[in-house]
Regions:
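Residue(s) in the substrate-gating loop at a strand-loop-helix junction
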Residues: 133
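C-terminal helical subdomain
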Residues: 169, 173-174, 194-236
Length: 237
């Protein structure tokens, strides 16, 4: 299964887990990475590898990817899906909290990309999806660090696309709106409290987003959807 490996970070829950299921169903070998990664029910063991690693730790991330490549072949697709959000006003956020958010949301994307990009470029093929947010183009009075990191992810995606498109590498920025995940748990609130704080908008499911990303992946290699914003119809954000 050379050149068929799909690497997903943040794969233990939410969008990452939905992506793992969608790409596995499509027949791909997988490396699923998260800080607390356990085997996923229903995924074939013979073509699924797991690694517990912090995306902010480049050495750990690279080791995990090289190990999976030794078994399944070179990485054909990387999906940088790990992320977190602190919705508090910035004056309430501790420096350690915003530093961690930057480590996961931006440094993690840089680390994952660095681990696979040189080989993709040399081969003349490969796809990198960076899961950003509609917050990468719209500011807000809360979640300031989150917004700043997502602006960075979008700029990184476009810069890499300009640098590597000529080498056959697709870089796709994915900017979801409200997606039903467990991101609220990290804020210490229930989903209903989270939804109310946002003004009770509609939410898409992680599975719906995963299907859209899989569609982008399936397009012929000479077609690159550079930047895609995906939101519920009934939302103003």
């Amino acid at each position: 299964m050379a050149d068929s490996l799909v690497v997903v970070t943040g794969a233990s829950s939410g969008i990452g887990l939905a992506l793992a299921r969608a790409f596995s169903k499509d027949g791909h070998a997988l490396l699923l990475i998260a800080r607390h990664m356990k085997p996923v029910d229903g995924l074939p063991a013979e073509r699924t590898a797991y690694a517990e690693a912090d995306v902010a730790d480049y050495a750990a991330l690279e080791r995990a990817i090289r190990g999976a490549e030794a078994k399944f072949g070179k990485t054909a697709c990387l999906i940088n899906s790990a992320g977190l959000a602190d919705a508090r006003e910035f004056k309430q956020v501790e420096p350690s909290a915003f530093a961690h958010e930057i480590d996961v949301n931006l440094k993690g994307v840089l680390n994952g990309t660095k681990a696979v990009l040189a080989d993709m470029s040399a081969r003349g093929s490969g796809t990198i999806f960076n899961i950003s947010s509609v917050s990468d183009r719209k500011t807000a009075p809360v979640a300031v660090t989150y917004t700043a990191t997502k602006y960075g992810v979008r700029a990184l995606s476009e810069s890499l696309r300009e640098a590597e498109g000529k080498n056959g590498v697709r870089v796709i920025n994915v900017a979801p709106g409200y997606i039903r995940t467990n991101i609220h748990a990290g804020m210490g609130i229930t989903f209903e409290e989270y939804k109310q704080a946002l003004g009770n908008p509609d939410f898409l499911t992680a599975e719906e987003l995963a299907d859209i990303i899989l569609y982008c992946w399936r397009l012929p290699p000479h077609i690159c959807i550079r930047d895609i914003a995906i939101t519920p119809t009934r939302t103003t954000f």
